[in-house]
UniProtKB/Swiss-Prot annotation:
Residues the entry annotates as binding NADP(+): 57-59, 194-200, 217-218
Keyword rRNA processing recorded: no
Residues binding FAD, per UniProt: 47-50, 59-60, 65
Function noted in UniProt: FAD-binding monooxygenase; part of the gene cluster that mediates the biosynthesis of aflatoxins, a group of polyketide-derived furanocoumarins, and part of the most toxic and carcinogenic compounds among the known mycotoxins. The four major aflatoxins produced by A.parasiticus are aflatoxin B1 (AFB1), aflatoxin B2 (AFB2), aflatoxin G1 (AFG1) and aflatoxin G2 (AFG2). The role of the FAD-binding monooxygenase aflW in aflatoxin biosynthesis has still to be characterized.
The protein's enzyme class: oxidoreductase
Protein name in the entry: FAD-binding monooxygenase aflW
Cofactor: FAD
Textual note on the cofactor: Binds 1 FAD per subunit.
Length: 481
C-alpha cells in the first residue's frame, strides 16, 4: 500500500475557534484521514457559546478576528459581541459543512496512550436529553487538544462566598439566562475583578442597575485603536458592508490596516524601548483625560509595564465608573456576610448579587487525565512548571498536539494567526505520519528544554517579566509560561 494513502484517525477535543479551524484544515488538506471532534456543549463556539455576560465580546477588532479562508463582510461592529462571533462561527461551519465531523453533548473524561498499538484511547461520556449518560471509547492515531484555556472559571477564594452569603452569586463565564436587565435593575451588585470580563460587564449593567460596587485590586492599561473611541463600539453601516461585498480587495485592505495597527504595538513591549515609553505616556495621559476623579485615576494606574497584561479597550468602562450609581473600591473582598461583602478596608457593603469577574484557570492543565508514555499524566507534568515544545507539543505525549499551550506566542493582539500556524503544523505531521508510515512521534526533552531556555532568556528583555497577574503567568518556579 502506498504510505501516502495510509488511513489515519484523528480526534480533536473541542469545537471552539481552534477546533473549527482544525476541522477545516483536515477536510481541505488531508485525504484518507477520518476526523471526529468531540464537544461537551450542545453546539460549536466554545468561549463564544458559553460567555454571555453583559457586553461580552472580543477585545480584538472583528476583521482581525476572522479566519483567512472565510473573510466576513457582514461584521456588524468594529469590536463584536459574543453573539456576533458565534453567528460567524456558525456560518463557517454551515458553509464548509464542518458539523458532519462533530459529536455534541459529549465530554472527554480521559485520554490514554497505548504504546503497543501506537494509538490513543479516548474515554467519553455522552449526555443526551434526560437519559442516563452513555460511556464509550474511541481510538485515534493522533490526538488534538483544542479546548482552550478560557472555559474553566476561576472562582475567588473568599470565605462565605458560597455558604454564607444569602443573595445570588454569579461567575461571568456562567452567566444565567434568568438574570438580565429586568432582574438586576432593582439590585445592588458587587463586581469583583478588573480584567476583561469586568471591563465589559460593568458598562453592560451600569445604565440600568440600581447600584454597583466594583472591587479592583490591580490597575489597568486601557487601550484604543484608531477609528474606534467613545462609549460604544463603532458600527459598520449597510454602505460599508455593501462595499466589502462588492469589493473584496477593500475588505482585505481594511482587515490588513487593522492588523497593522494591532501588530504595530509590538515594539512597545520591549523593556526600556522608545515604543514602551511612548505607549505608556500616551495611554496614561489618555486615561487621565477621560477619568476626571483623581482617586479613580490613581487607583487604576498600573504598577506594571504597558502590555504585560492584555491591553483592553475600556472607554465604556471608564465612563461607567464615573456615574452616580457606581462606587469603585481599591481593595480586595476578604469575606462575605449574609447580606454582602467585606473589603480589605474592613467595611461591609450590602448587596443583592455578587458577580465574580475573576477570569479562568489558565494553568494549561487539562481538566481530565491525559496519560502519555510510561504513565505520565499531563495534569501532573504541568502542575509545577508547564512547558512545551513551540507551545504545541509535549515530551512523553506521543502523537499529541495542543492549541494555546505553555509558551504559546501570543499575549496581545489576535489569536487567529498563531492558531492558523498550529493547525498547519498539525497537518504537516499528519501528512508526514502517512507518507513515512510513522507509528509515533514526540518532541525530545532536551530540544524542548533548549526551546524553553531560549524563551526565558528572550522574556528578560520584555514587559512580560513583570508581575502583573496576567494569563501569561509565572508558574510556581520563576519561569514565564
Amino acid at each position: 500500500m502506498d504510505p501516502a494513502n495510509r488511513p489515519l484517525r484523528v480526534v480533536t477535543i473541542g469545537t471552539g475557534i481552534s477546533g473549527i479551524l482544525m476541522a477545516y484544515q483536515i477536510q481541505k488538506q488531508c485525504p484518507n484521514v477520518e476526523h471526529v471532534l468531540y464537544e461537551k456543549n450542545a453546539d460549536v463556539g466554545g468561549t463564544w457559546l458559553e460567555n454571555r455576560y453583559p457586553m461580552a465580546g472580543c477585545d480584538v477588532p472583528s476583521h482581525a478576528y476572522t479566519y483567512p479562508f472565510a473573510p466576513n463582510p457582514d461584521w456588524p461592529r468594529y469590536f463584536s459581541y459574543a453573539p456576533d462571533i458565534w453567528n460567524y462561527l456558525d456560518r463557517v461551519c454551515k458553509v464548509f459543512d464542518l458539523r458532519r465531523y462533530m459529536v455534541f453533548h459529549t465530554e472527554v473524561v480521559g485520554c490514554y496512550w497505548n504504546e503497543d498499538r501506537g494509538e490513543w484511547t479516548v474515554r467519553l461520556r455522552q449526555h443526551v436529553g434526560g437519559s442516563e449518560p452513555r460511556d464509550f471509547e474511541d481510538h485515534c492515531h493522533i490526538l488534538v487538544h483544542a479546548s482552550g484555556v478560557f472555559n474553566n472559571p476561576q472562582w475567588p477564594q473568599i470565605p462565605g462566598l458560597h455558604d454564607r452569603f444569602q443573595g445570588r452569586v454569579i461567575h461571568t463565564a456562567r452567566w444565567p439566562d434568568d438574570y438580565q436587565e429586568s432582574q438586576w435593575k432593582h439590585d445592588r451588585v458587587a463586581v469583583i475583578g478588573s480584567g476583561a470580563s469586568s471591563i465589559q460587564t460593568v458598562p453592560g449593567m451600569q445604565p440600568t442597575v440600581k447600584h454597583l460596587d466594583v472591587f479592583v485590586r490591580t490597575g489597568v492599561w486601557f487601550g484604543v485603536l484608531a477609528g474606534n473611541t467613545g462609549s460604544q463600539t463603532k458600527e459598520y453601516t449597510s454602505t460599508d458592508k455593501d462595499e466589502f461585498r462588492r469589493n473584496p480587495a477593500a475588505l482585505v485592505a481594511h482587515a490588513k490596516a487593522i492588523e497593522d495597527q494591532v501588530n504595530g504595538m509590538w515594539g512597545a513591549f520591549y523593556t526600556g524601548s522608545k515604543g514602551q515609553a511612548m505607549g505608556s505616556a500616551f495611554f496614561r495621559q489618555r486615561t487621565a483625560n477621560l477619568i476626571k476623579d483623581e482617586r479613580l485615576r490613581e487607583g487604576l494606574d498600573p504598577s506594571f509595564a504597558f502590555g504585560c497584561r492584555r491591553i483592553t479597550p475600556g472607554d465604556p468602562y471608564m465612563e461607567a465608573i464615573q456615574k452616580e450609581n457606581v462606587d469603585v473600591h481599591f481593595t480586595p473582598v476578604v469575606s462575605c456576610t449574609e447580606k454582602g461583602v467585606v473589603g480589605g478596608d474592613g467595611v461591609e457593603r450590602e448587596v443583592d448579587t455578587i458577580v465574580c469577574a475573576t477570569g479562568f484557570d489558565s494553568s494549561y492543565r487539562p481538566r481530565f487525565p491525559i496519560v502519555g508514555r510510561d504513565g505520565v499524566d499531563l495534569r501532573e507534568k504541568w502542575k509545577e512548571c508547564p512547558n512545551s515544545y513551540l507551545g504545541l507539543a509535549v515530551p512523553e505525549m506521543p502523537n499529541f498536539f495542543t492549541f494555546i499551550g505553555p509558551t504559546w506566542p501570543i499575549q496581545n493582539g489576535s489569536v487567529i494567526g498563531p492558531l492558523q500556524a498550529v493547525s498547519k503544523y498539525v497537518v504537516q505531521w499528519i501528512k508526514k505520519a502517512q507518507n513515512e508510515n510513522l507509528r509515533s512521534f514526540v518532541p525530545r526533552q532536551d530540544r524542548t528544554d533548549q526551546f524553553n531556555d531560549h524563551v526565558q532568556e528572550w522574556v528578560k528583555h520584555t514587559v512580560w517579566k513583570d508581575n502583573c497577574r496576567s494569563c501569561t503567568f509565572l508558574s510556581r518556579r520563576p519561569r514565564l509560561t
